Amino acid sequence: PHTIVFLGDLFKIWLAPPKFWSDLHRQVLLSFQSLKDKGCNVVFIAGNREMLLPGKFTDNWKKKLPFTHLIHNDWFLNWGNQHFGFIHGDTINYHDRQYLRWKSFSHSLAVETIFQLMPGPAARWIAERIEAMLVETNKEYKVHFPEKEIQEFAESVLPGVDNYFVGHFHVDREIKVEGCSSVLRIVPDWLSQRKLIRISAEGTKEVLHFKNSSFENAH
């Protein structure tokens, strides 16, 4: 492919510096490096399960991570005759204050400094325990799809693009806005649905389902 965009949450938890990587992390990231080495644009948009990612994607970090682009907010692509936007989306639901406080704390300089000083296995163990604990908290917002907040977000971004892709919510939905032909697409998660969205050179979209060791058109 010319460009591949990942909308974050690659693993249940991932500490970005290589000293923290498990064998699974290395296996997946080596596959991304293979794409990068072949000239593919590998765009990674940070989600809520990544920690210790650099604020600036310096040349030193580009040698460590298998991405051509590292994005912390939204990213845009002109492809064919279409203009596309992408974001992870974990901050769209502004009413989930408990999560927003947690994200601010877990990505604070103090917390990141403590993790950086730890040995790799110990840091991974603590991060995994924190992730397991978070699964059991704030369930009201995790099972509730924020219709109102998503609609408001769509109204704010769709006038400037043809399509806008959002991750995080682990559902397959299209959101439209009255008086606008653009579409906001909630992208299905890979872990449970094994789906991805491919955009042709002309800008048309198709959903591919990975089944029986190959991809097939899902619609």
Predicted regions and their residues:
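Membrane-proximal helix-turn-helix segments that form the acceptor-binding/catalytic region
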Residues: 33, 133, 153-156
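Short, charged/polar low-complexity linear motifs in solvent-exposed/disordered segments
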Residues: 31-32, 40, 102-104, 111-112, ...
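Active-site-proximal loop/helix segment associated with metal-binding centers of metalloenzymes
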Residues: 87-149
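Conserved beta-sheet core of the metallophosphoesterase superfamily
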Residues: 60-67, 72, 83-85, 90, ...
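A structural signal for the main folded, soluble domain(s) of proteins
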Residues: 212-214
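Core catalytic region of metal-dependent phosphoesterases/phosphodiesterases
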Residues: 1-79
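C-terminal regulatory/interaction regions
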Residues: 216-219
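Short low-complexity stretches enriched in small and charged residues
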Residues: 1-2, 36-45, 88, 119-123, ...
